[in-house]
Amino acid sequence: MPALPDAAAFDGTGVNVGVIDNGFDADPATDHHKKAVAGALREVIAPDAAEPIKDGKVANHGAIVSRIIGGQVVSGDDFGKGVATGVNLYQANQRATFTNLALRDLLSTLNARGVKIVNNSWSFVQDPKYAPPDGEETKPDSLTVRAFFPALDEAVNDHGQLLVWANGNESQPNPYLLAAAPRVLPALERGWLTVTQVFANDELAPWSNACGIAANWCISARSPDDKKLTGTSFAAPVVAAAAARVSQAYPWMDNSALRQTLLSTADDMGNRARFGWGRLNMARAVRGPALFDTRLTLGGDFVADFDGMRSEFFNDINGDAGLTKAGTGALVLWGYNRYAGATTITKGTVELYGSVAGDISIQADGVLSADGGVARHDVTNSGMLAAQGNGLLILGDYLATGAGATLATQLGTLISVDGKAQLGGSGLRVDKPDDSYVVKTRETAIKACQVVDRFGSVTAGAGLLYTVSADYSATQVDLNVARSNVATVAHDLYGGQAGRLAAAQAIETAFAATDAKVLGADSNVSDAFIQRAARLQNVGSAAQLAAALDSVSGQIHASSQALGFQQSQAVNRALSNRVDQLALAGARSGMWMQMMGGTGKLKQSGFAGADTRLYGGQLGVDHRVTDDGILGLSLTWSDAKADFDHYGGQSRSQGTGLSLYGRYGAENGPYVSARAGHEWRHADVKRDILAGGVDRVESGRNDRVTSLYAEIGHAFAFDSGRVTPFVGVSYDHLARGAIDESDGAFALQARKKSYDQGAGQLGLRLQSSPLDWAGGVTTLTAYGAYRYGNPTRLDFTAAFAGAPDASFEVQGIGLPRHTGWLGLGASSQLAGDVSWYASYDAQFGPGGLTNNVFAAGLRYRFQ
């Protein structure tokens, strides 16, 4: 059992409490009552009905009552702190002489403000005709009852308000009419409390009326000061404030449940006629009811009806009534409960950690959850019985009513039945504890004096990565549990999706090593990996497994290498366009700069795809070494990013390189051009791993790329321009650095590896005659090229950090065999020796458009 709630932790925060009274303003010259409640006060209702003067003095009755409920300590007087200082306080003025309509208006207005607890430290005049049981105005057909009780009935039964009454100060054996009202109209009792005053020595205050005929809804309480605050008027607000604190602890409780909780947890003082249910016990009250008793339930069960929350009863609960759980929420029973009635779960959940004496009936929409609980009688299941941890002991019979019933149990959890267990074709669902890794095991699920029938279905709770079957004997049900092959499961679910299948094989390889470790063999698998593997085994759906596989796969490390090659090709294409400009007549030595940007896609069936972005630039110098020959040197920098879908992650590659390039040949006729470059890159990868939890892993590595390109072609001149067919060959070499992701059970580790791709190109360039316009003498260009490369796979061998000896292949997007380029460009000679140029290049692959590169630059030619 967890630590018991401390009453001091509850101050009524968020609970609306009303006070029907008068004399709220008091006298600020002589007391601080109004100042003390200023922080709690939300509204003064019916201010026109205030009567500040009574018997020639400043009235302060309502002010004192309010301060007892929610007042703060104020420097300068000795009045103590209120019982529930967190409440929202509403003061409602009621005249000394009032009508039934005025009372109804006050109660209705309070209800409209959300007030469900109302303190009433007032009464009708102390006249024998209002004294039950024989007073003439206490009869059901009396004028007073017929006039006022409909408003009270509306407040209790329509609005759900709990009305707390002062028991009166006439030293009588019974209270007067209002405190005893349920004696006249029994329907009021569900929302009625009357409070008699006692002293610290448990003696009834000499002026206080005894509970008498109101004993069943009467509770005893002290005022905050036995000597100064005399009268039941000042004991009642203590109980009203206590109700607010219980309401804070159990916000779902209606007026009847609040009443039952306060009365059932009171300390029995022996004489019911004097003290009712006994002395208020706040410490017990905030821990839930202590009785389910027909005297309190008024003939039925205690009803816990709430949605969307988990609420706990800590007290040992006795009584002759039962419990009905309604609503979707969960009610937790911690105590040793001996109430004799049945526990009926019509909806929602009852969590049993303690014990229940009577029968338990689980309806179709109900759940009984147990972890070490004891059911001391029969359990009938038409919904779900869920046992985990320390299981459930049933001292009677267990009866499942048919296929609509489910028994859900965890591996290692035993349901023990002293009587017979009648399974009745119901369903069995077996869940695996989060921290329990399964290889192959046999567990006992049920032990009984007699097992009758069988389960109609047996399923694994998660249902994907382990299997369950049941064996039956005369007295028990045993479970055979085995781990499923992850690769086989993935193949059945995701056939053709290479990335997921590779990830599944990787996990299966690591799980095989984990099996060996769990079974006692010497296997290099960390405890953290076993824990994460155990949680991963609990994956509950194909969608969840897909997300786990996508995130675990590490395919981003393979696929992002394709980004590196794409990055290299984009830089090479931009430089090739620049080299082609060297063929123009009059091209002399000079220097140039170029900026480029691009967007693209990485995609291949079966793998996570990515949107890519590229930024970069080049700075170069050209030198004409002969009439037909030019050599150049350029400095290149680039920054490429890729965001992968399907939990692939994010990749960033930043590079700096040098290129040597040249062209030999006249403007028209045959030519040869070439480029050789080397680039130093740093690549960062960030991704989330959704395997038995969420891990953010990061890695950085240093790569090197060497690129070679050679081209020959022939330029044919025409009146309108020039046509140049060409062929080219290229070679790219990527030396990828080692991969070492940050610590994590499923983090990847891989040694460095190199990749090569050779390719051939066939293309055609078009160039217009110079056009003279405001932007300068401009030449337009266009080209198309087909590229044929060897379809390089970028896979590599890796292992999980938590199972470093269980290596596997990481697959990702490879380099395609067939690609093509189309481009447009323009160059323009400005005044003097400055020219500008711009180009657009589009790359196409098997999936369509894969890359867009925009470039623009300036060149200055030397004299």
Model-derived segments and their meaning:
Residues P2-L101, R113, K129, L188-G191, ...:
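Subtilisin-like serine protease catalytic core
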Residues I68, V73-V74, A92-Q94, I219-F275:
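Hydrolase catalytic cores
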Residues V367-R442, G760:
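Extracellular beta-strand/loop-rich repeat segments of large surface/secreted proteins
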Residues S742, F746-Q863:
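Outer membrane beta-barrel transmembrane domains
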